[in-house]
Amino acid sequence: MTSKSHWKLLALALVLVVVMVWYSISREDRYIEFFYFPVSEKKEPCFQGEAERQASKIFGNHSREQPIFLQLKDYFWVKTPSAYELPFGTKGSEDLLLRVLAITSYSIPESIQSLECRRCVVVGNGHRLKNSSLGGVINKYDVVIRLNNAPVAGYEGDVGSKTTIRLFYPESAHFDPKIENNPDTLLVLVAFKAMDFHWIETILSDKKRVRKGFWKQPPLIWDVNPKQIRILNPFFMEIAADKLLSLPIQQPRKIKQKPTTGLLAITLALHLCDLVHIAGFGYPDAYNKKQTIHYYEQITLKSMAGSGHNVSQEAVAIKRMLEMGAVKNLTYF
């Protein structure tokens, strides 16, 4: 055998070994170094307006002019016409919305307003938070944004105990606000349909409960302070759908593709904060039928069938934001 042939065989053997090792590692571990930065005990420097500059590249400069939360004065004294129905606008739902805005608030707390530079983390519900030991790190951020019914009690070591903002919708409100939130947590309603306004009104005003019009029965009793409730401006759902996912805003009623609460929360953070980090985002591969998707329950991707969410498309959007430095990742993606 010539020396040239000998080296070719050695090279081929080496390639085979590398391939075997590569595929013996789980996909998540394989990409653990991508779009991930090691967590430091020191706070990362925060530069005022940095997230705004990054957001303008994605959403355009005009998006910062929009209020984060809906206000009564914009619907009571001056009619604010909306071009779209929920979840991308308020067209056709104004009367119900007025009643809700009359008993809730819209202000951003002084504890956030007064910050020279707002350091925020959006905590996803992903399985990769399990055994992450990120709780202490998460608690150090000025603003901690959580999603839906993701629990804190019993998981503090991995997800922290601080909750500044929690986004929810009626069907995801199956959590005890007294246990899973802090006393000053803002509960921000993401309205997908007019019945969502009706539900929150009946809860806060103790009226006859609504039982129909939901894909899952929401709580009939929910002990919350109306002054802690905010209504998210559906503008943020619109730009997340349009600018991040390229979804049509005018859709047939039976289709209704829409962003997940997680992607919506990142969009919100880029408009509220100066520094935005994320943790616990990402789903298993589509072929992985057994991997759980949340850190707190045993459900798989199968549970998202028919949800109107395209998680593959959202992964591309989040990867794009990570690549351009608009957000940084505490876990891996």
Swiss-Prot record:
So which stretches are on the Lumenal side?
Answer: 27-333
Q: What GO MF annotations does this protein's record show?
A: beta-D-galactosyl-(1->3)-N-acetyl-beta-D-galactosaminide alpha-2,3- sialyltransferase; beta-galactoside (CMP) alpha-2,3-sialyltransferase activity; N-acetyllactosaminide alpha-2,3-sialyltransferase activity
Query: For this UniProt entry, which segments traverse the membrane?
Result: 9-26
Q: Which pathway does it operate in?
A: Protein modification; protein glycosylation; Glycolipid biosynthesis
Q: Which Gene3D superfamilies match?
A: Glycosyl transferase family 29 (3.90.1480.20)
Which Gene Ontology cellular-component terms appear in the entry?
Golgi cisterna membrane
Q: EC number(s) in its UniProt entry?
A: 2.4.3.2, 2.4.3.4, 2.4.3.6
Q: Does the keyword Translocase apply?
A: no
Please list the disulfide bridges: C120-C273
Location in the cell reads: Golgi apparatus, Golgi stack membrane
Q: What biological process terms from GO does the record include? A: cognition; glycolipid biosynthetic process; glycoprotein biosynthetic process; lipid glycosylation; oligosaccharide biosynthetic process; positive regulation of blood coagulation; positive regulation of leukocyte tethering or rolling; protein glycosylation
Q: Which residues lie on this side of the membrane: Cytoplasmic?
A: 1-8
- Which InterPro entries does its entry note? Glyco_trans_29, Glycosyltransferase_29, GT29-like_sf, Sialyl_trans
* Topology in membrane: Single-pass type II membrane protein
Domain of life where this protein originates: Eukaryota
Which reaction equations make up its catalytic activity? a beta-D-galactosyl-(1->3)-N-acetyl-beta-D-galactosaminyl derivative + CMP-N-acetyl-beta-neuraminate = an N-acetyl-alpha-neuraminyl-(2->3)-beta-D-galactosyl-(1->3)-N-acetyl-beta-D-galactosaminyl derivative + CMP + H(+); a beta-D-galactosyl-(1->3)-N-acetyl-alpha-D-galactosaminyl derivative + CMP-N-acetyl-beta-neuraminate = an N-acetyl-alpha-neuraminyl-(2->3)-beta-D-galactosyl-(1->3)-N-acetyl-alpha-D-galactosaminyl derivative + CMP + H(+); a beta-D-galactosyl-(1->4)-N-acetyl-beta-D-glucosaminyl derivative + CMP-N-acetyl-beta-neuraminate = an N-acetyl-alpha-neuraminyl-(2->3)-beta-D-galactosyl-(1->4)-N-acetyl-beta-D-glucosaminyl derivative + CMP + H(+); a ganglioside GM1 (d18:1(4E)) + CMP-N-acetyl-beta-neuraminate = a ganglioside GD1a (d18:1(4E)) + CMP + H(+)
Assigned keywords, A-Z? Disulfide bond, Glycoprotein, Glycosyltransferase, Golgi apparatus, Lipid metabolism, Membrane, Signal-anchor, Transferase, Transmembrane, Transmembrane helix
**Function of this protein?**
A beta-galactoside alpha2-3 sialyltransferase involved in terminal sialylation of glycoproteins and glycolipids. Catalyzes the transfer of sialic acid (N-acetyl-neuraminic acid; Neu5Ac) from the nucleotide sugar donor CMP-Neu5Ac onto acceptor Galbeta-(1->3)-GalNAc- and Galbeta-(1->4)-GlcNAc-terminated glycoconjugates through an alpha2-3 linkage. Plays a major role in hemostasis. Responsible for sialylation of plasma VWF/von Willebrand factor, preventing its recognition by asialoglycoprotein receptors (ASGPR) and subsequent clearance. Regulates ASGPR-mediated clearance of platelets.
Q: Which family does it belong to?
A: Belongs to the glycosyltransferase 29 family.
Q: What is this protein called?
A: CMP-N-acetylneuraminate-beta-galactosamide-alpha-2,3-sialyltransferase 4
